Amino acid sequence: MSDPVKTTMVASEHPCDKAFSATSIKNYIAAFFAQFGTQGMAYTLFSSYLSVVFTDYLGVNPAAIGMVLSVGVFTDIIMGNVMDRVHTKWGKARHWFFWSALPVAICVGLMFMCPVSASDTVKVIWALVLYNVYCTCLTSVRLPAFSLPSVCSDNSRTRMLLVWVASEGTNVAATVTGWIIGPIVAIYKGNPLSGWRLLGWIMAGATLLLLVLAGALLTEKRNGADLERIEAERKAMKHTEKAMGLGEQYSYLLRNKYWLLFQGGGLCNGMSLGFLIGSMGYWIQHVLGPSGLAGDNPIGLIMTVMNVPMMVAPFLILPFIKFVDAKNIVVMFMGLGAVFSLGMWACGLKIWWLFVVLMILRQCVGSCVNGSANVLLTRAIDYGEWKFGVRQEGVGSSFSSALNKVSMGVATAVLGFVLANSGYSGGGTVGESTQAALNFLFMGLPGIAMAVGTVFYGLSLGSKKWNQIRAELDERNAVQQ
């Protein structure tokens, strides 16, 4: 039996749709912790330095470790399907934070524990197995974290705030990670590998705590009886009790033009971030570090220059999100990001102050893109529900995460082959040609990718049409309840 209070409640009166209700505030904190734990600390460490540790301190061939880290894409797609099928009384996402916290933490702690005396084959197998188990476990909580704007609220402003807060969690975590890497590794001056291992276990404990806290604070809008009703409606629409197959699910997505456009823009943005983050560790160590421009802690300095602007920028435009369409924000700042990134590549380190200014500007606009783009995904999911009667938060979000992994894997594999072909065997210096390649991977390719992504995002669903779609969906739900 439906709740008489709930049946008379319009979407805008639901606690999850009120931007500053107690429920929404707890959801913002949960989104912050979720991204801090999934996209921030350990993820930042592994994205930029896992290959460095295995090549420089464990002696693994760069090309081999590059291929190992390029695997692990399909777990995202599979988990998206699982997320849409596995519901609990809490909803679609919340339970995953409790189920996955410990496995993720264990994988993080064990990642750098491979014995130095082991053969190269054993080291590669260690990295292959642990990294892919880590990716699988992380995906099981990372996708629910990505889906929070969609599962927590139907209000555009609340969704935007959820996305912004989550983005802040990523940036704060990445900055903290950048500053603690050097000091913790330096604890073991004669044996830096022990420092990396200690760092891994610190990250493991922090990840476990953050994910459990995120799950404890989270409240989804559609849970319990709501999910049962939605599932019943889908079955009635199909006139069958047979569960929707994977092919059927993707057939809906492939007919959703706005989902396809979002994935095109997401692929470009993912490639930009993939090459930027994937090459950052080597770029700092072999291009910036030898120049002496960044002082004694180049990791901390660059992470600060990259992430502090990303933390500050959202607050500067936050007052305007009620009046400016998220699509316009994404398109404008994506285009500016391309200009600034290509400007960095052209400038190089020859004019250090200009390089830093351009990096700050690029990170500011990049934060605005990352903090707004997921709103376009939630609109695409709403469009799919409006057009086909099927709401696909999990599988609809999974491709975005998979594309991020594709780009990161490609970047890591390319880096590995570039270093291997230059004769680099770990811990040594590189030639000018390798430095030029690292500059292109760190600055040139990200700029090109952002320029192409601007076109895809420019064709995405705007607020005017989305508001009409959302109103019709709310009317349908009110009648069906």
Cite the ranges covered by each PLM segment:
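Intracellular loop-helix junctions on the cytosolic face of multi-pass helical membrane proteins
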Residues: 1-25, 117-128, 141, 145-281, ...
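Glycine-rich segments within core transmembrane alpha-helices of 12-TM secondary carriers
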Residues: 72, 104, 161-185, 303-307, ...
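Central cavity-lining transmembrane alpha-helices of secondary-active solute carriers
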Residues: 65-86, 106, 175, 304-316
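Short amphipathic helix-loop junctions that connect adjacent transmembrane helices
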Residues: 48-63, 278-297
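Cytoplasmic membrane-interface "Motif A"-like loop-to-helix N-cap segments
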Residues: 85-103, 321-336, 385-391
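C-terminal transmembrane helical hairpin of 12-TM major facilitator-type secondary transporters
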Residues: 330-373
